[in-house]
């Protein structure tokens, strides 16, 4: 089923953030629970990066979708209230940041329900889901349907939104090329050969991909993390890039939920 774009629009653009804070580091390696230096990278996202992100979006008059683990929402309620107060959408991103492929069906259900409850305490209905690690189990879509979710943003098999035929869940495809993590993620406990990319280089990559998707009438799903994109040089790059996107009158800049409703 094709996207029903607003009049005069030829493609869609979604600004999304995975507000993982410390949870992504705990999921990567449980031993990180005893490594405050490692965890502080996630804390930066909550304490500094998110504020810079929200200020940038407010300055540009843009709305975004924040996919947030439930445990992060519980740990940082003030930040969650600010996200909601500014009119942004909340999306489900697990309770912890554990891949569904590592869970039994009962454990995955518990993650789904606890995460949903943690987000909805901030007064907003949560209908969108993004899997931690962009991976799903054989049970994921059955559970999403059973518990009132309307869309997923976890798969990489298209540049246009589509309906999962067996479940009637809208998929808003993602791709690593439009994620900030491959360019900016770095940990001293990981691969020291990984190179941190310059913000200028990443903007060039994102511009080229956006231009290509726009020409094909697709969805550009930009995926970022406050702890990575929220560094001073990168937030300046993000403002430049979003200003460039806004300069194209035929681009529909919307939240993930708005795009999903245009498909279903």
Model-derived regions, located:
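Catalytic alpha-helical scaffold of carbohydrate-active enzymes acting on polysaccharides/glycoconjugates
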Residues: 1-128, 133-177, 200-222, 230-264
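Surface-exposed cleft-lining segments at the edges of enzyme active sites
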Residues: 126, 188-199, 225-227
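Glycine-rich, positively charged active-site loop/lid region within alpha/beta enzyme cores that binds
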Residues: 171-195
């Amino acid at each position: 089923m094709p996207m029903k774009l607003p009049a005069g629009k030829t493609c869609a653009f979604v600004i999304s953030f995975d507000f993982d804070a410390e949870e992504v580091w705990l999921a990567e390696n449980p031993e990180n629970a005893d490594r405050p230096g490692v965890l502080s990278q996630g804390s930066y996202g909550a304490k500094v990066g998110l504020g810079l992100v929200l200020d940038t979006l407010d300055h540009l008059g843009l709305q975004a979708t924040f996919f947030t683990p439930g445990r992060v929402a519980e740990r940082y309620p003030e930040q969650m209230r600010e996200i909601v107060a500014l009119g942004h959408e909340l999306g489900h991103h697990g309770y912890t940041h554990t891949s569904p492929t590592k869970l039994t069906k009962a454990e995955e259900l518990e993650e789904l329900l606890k995460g949903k409850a943690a987000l909805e305490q901030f007064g907003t209905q949560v209908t969108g889901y993004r899997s931690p690690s962009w991976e799903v189990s054989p049970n994921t879509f059955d559970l999403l349907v059973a518990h009132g979710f309307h869309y997923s943003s976890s798969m990489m098999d298209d540049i246009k939104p589509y309906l999962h035929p067996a479940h009637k869940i809208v998929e808003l495809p993602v791709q690593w090329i439009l994620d900030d993590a491959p360019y900016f993620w770095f940990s001293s406990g990981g691969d020291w050969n990984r190179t941190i990319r310059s913000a200028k280089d990443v903007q060039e990559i994102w511009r080229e991909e956006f231009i290509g998707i726009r020409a094909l009438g697709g969805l550009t799903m930009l995926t970022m993390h406050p702890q990575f994109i929220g560094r001073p040089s990168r937030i300046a790059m993000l403002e430049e890039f979003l200003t460039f996107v806004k300069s194209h009158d035929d681009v529909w800049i919307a939240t993930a939920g708005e795009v999903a409703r245009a498909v279903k």
